[in-house]
């Protein structure tokens, strides 16, 4: 059977500065989270999240959450990178309730994956424009973190 190969890119962490509960919409319940402070670091790039990012996530009737995130990253050498992703988080109702209550829950108890894409005009990071990546996430009471991998 063929094997899917990947290479670690970076770990990204972000806080939520403000949450807007839009309410019940046709696809579920819409929340718009304004992203606060954050950073990313890996072997080929590191830096910070710029203010103004947001997650326009949907909480679906089946209990899963679908993120819809837009961020601008600034590398430590000043390059700007637009990052956008969607994905899915799901787990048992009891585990999701613990996360919602702010409890620290092991990421082995739920599924949190995303598919980031990147856009940049910076020549040094141009390779990001042509890759597929996958993020494996965990939700902490005060931030979210994702380990991001390039699919080779």
Regions found by a protein language model. Give the residues of each.
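Beta-strand-enriched cores of mature, soluble protein domains
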Residues: 1-152
